[in-house]
Amino acid sequence: RGLGDVYKRQDQKVRQRVGQVQRDMVLREQLHVLQHELGEDGDDELYEYEERIGRCRASDEVREKLMKELHRLSKQPFGSAEGAVIRNYLDVCLDVPWGVETHDRADVEQARKILDRDHYGLEKVKERILEFIAVRQLNPQAKGKILCLVGPPGVGKTSIALSVAKAMHRKLSRLSLGGVRDEADIRGHRKTYIGAMPGRIIDAVIRSGSMNPLLVLDEIDKLASDMRGDPASALLEVLDSEQNHAFRDHFLEVPVDLSRVMFITTANTLDTIPRPLLDRMEVIELSSYTDEEKLQIAKRHLLPKQLKEHGLKKTQLRITDDAIRRVIAAYTKESGVRVLERQLGKLCRKAAMQLVEGDVKRVDVTESNLKELLGTERYSAVSYTHLRAHETELHLV
């Protein structure tokens, strides 16, 4: 009798399990029909992911990882939180431009033309950049040092990096490091965290759409560190040519080859850049502009740009050289030309108002009517550059 009870209990358990399995199968089939009616067929989604993974030009290790995640996704019930995490992970991984590269055009003469067209002066800086490009032309596989452009705000550090990207025919992506305190901003957050995303480096590569872009790391001297980690240490791995061929972002969890990426960093000062980071970079210093250089930059670059942005033609606004000199001396006090560009933009807006409201067909800006347009002079009309030179002479005496 005891043995019969055991068989009976086992038979009941088997029947219960079979019933549960059959119930689950029926529910899954009903869910599948509902998803199909709603246009949310999970099989179509899985097939699409599988096709994208098949077309992906990533390494076998990466594709194997993606297929594992896809298999996990197939086991998730519709609408589950974990399913959403896996979908986000697959989407980000497949957005990485695996195997996509642009062909370098390391032509020194073309680079010289672009640098001369986009920037006035800065001869020593241009020469060093051309040397850098010449080495790339002779040896495309050369692991040159990272360039670090150092100088006051507004002297053209970032715009020079843009010109280098044009000259080398590389995609460009910029990221600002100012105020970055968390190491996860560089390495990314693990995908299990809510709202997790890859770090800024991988994000910049994705935005560029190429595995060999030129990445401009702005304000590298503004990096900070706190209890959440040291982002400068994470950057060491990114910039080190011996390590960055297998950079691991915490979100992606697979190696990414950054060895083909060209990095240019910018900074206002070297004092706050950690020494290990500085040792991996070659510093190119950009000095302040003289008043005459500012005048030429305004005429060749800033004014044409502002005219275009404000919808004005060259024939509708004329600014004399003396007026620009007065703007430089009395309305700006800077090493670069950012404030000068803003003041020229203000003159363009004033001109636009006069052209729209009045009967004038051209606005002439001279030294005599400058106050009417820009208001009271902010600084002494003595040249700021000359004033600094005079102070230096007094100090030497």
Description of each model-found segment:
Residues S208-N212, R248-T266:
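AAA+/SF3 P-loop NTPase mechanochemical coupling elements
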Residues R1, D5-V135:
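Extended, charged alpha-helical coiled-coil/arm scaffolds that mediate oligomerization and mechanical coupling
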Residues D221-P255:
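Conserved catalytic/switch belt of AAA+ P-loop NTPases
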Residues G2-Q10, T385-L394:
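Conserved small/polar residues in nucleotide/adenosyl-binding loops
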Residues H169-I194:
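AAA+/P-loop NTPase substrate/partner-engagement loops
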Residues A58-S59, L270-D279, S287-E334, R338-V339, ...:
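Conserved C-terminal "switch" segment of AAA+ ATPases
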Residues L147-L175:
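Walker A/P-loop
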Residues R338, Q343-R388:
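C-terminal engagement/docking regions of AAA+ P-loop ATPases
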